[in-house]
Amino acid sequence: PGNLDVPGLAFAAGNCLTWTTQPMSLRLPLGTNLTTGELFFSFALRVDALGPSFTGVGTLAGVTTGTGTLFGSKINIRTNGSVGFQLGLSKATGTAYGAWAPDDFAVGETIFVVGRYRFNPSSDTDDTCALWLNPDRTSFGAIVPPSATIAEVGAGGADLPQVDRFFFRAGSGSTTPAKLVTDELRIGLTWASVTPPAVVPALRLVSSGDTAALLWPTNAPGFVLEESSAVMSAPWFAVSEPIRTNGVNFSVDISLTNNSRYFRLRH
């Protein structure tokens, strides 16, 4: 319970991580040391409460090496001066070698965050970072990433000699929201590996007399059964019939008439 689902993404499962303003640093070893190429990561993020003390700039997550304080693809957060917040990306210490996304996010909103750290060989300050916030679901699983929300920042800041772990962190009440939730952390070498698309379950029809049951498995939550009077041109909307659980399936009973009704599952 409490998982953060991202529409179009593979279903969330297992536990999520919740933290508050209490200072902490959770460093997760990757099991390898990367010194070349690219590293991608993704996770779902929801801020449940900002808190009255949250007035500064904080760091939520990113990649690093060992127990040091030099970071790469660092996900930053700040209040927008109203009732929401903004996310940014930077490399090294502070936020000088980075940028802020223009998006204003609200408390309770689930955000899909994708980051990348790219090793460049020319100098000790030329590695770059990129950030995607809520990328279009049509890009999930693609070979080539879509255009980034923040593209290729970090040049000029100190490079990481290697990347061997991912971290989540909290600083203090002034730099960390009062309550945050993250879920479905994925780390890989390609965009596709951290944006696996949801597999649409099969929709079955079982008829009996003048009624029929539409069935799909309960292990594929997050899908909405929609209907339309035409496949191509008419709008789609959620069915009005109640959805019930029938064993290992969700089930909707419909009356069979002479009117055309088309059905689909949408995540």
Predicted regions and their residues:
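Short tryptophan-centered beta-strand motifs in secreted/extracellular beta-sheet-rich domains
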Residues: 41-43, 108-122, 129-133
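Short, aromatic/His-centered strand-loop micro-motif at the edge of beta-sheets
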Residues: 88-112, 119
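Extended recognition patches within non-cytosolic domains
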Residues: 184-199
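Short, composition-biased motifs enriched in small/polar/acidic residues
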Residues: 196-267
